[in-house]
């Protein structure tokens, strides 16, 4: 199993979002001109570098697909993804997670494993119900 380093994560996000992420030190924050995305790096437990992403929903759907591709290529290091329909998606990355746990807003277990199709199915389900909120956790 190969884990993505922070520099690799930054490059992948730049490719996905089409933005140059200059700051990557702990505590720094990147905000784009249109407030479409906020990227903030911090220490998860004083040893794990974690990046937090908050962005609008349509951009979040692109991130979901990117995460599925990362899973299929064994870049498995996502800690959790929170998707709020038509509002925001929160994506948490860290360098020490692998298995995927999917719960709905009420904490009901939907899926556990590391299958990329699970994320794509969640993506499809989000289109059906504007009130759906999912939390996806790895680790």
Q: Which residues make up each language-model segment?
A:
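Acidic, low-complexity, intrinsically disordered interaction modules
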Residues: 23-127
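Short, mixed-charge low-complexity intrinsically disordered segments
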Residues: 127-139
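Phosphoinositide-dependent membrane-docking surfaces
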Residues: 12-22, 88-89
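Phosphoinositide-binding peripheral membrane targeting modules
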Residues: 2-15
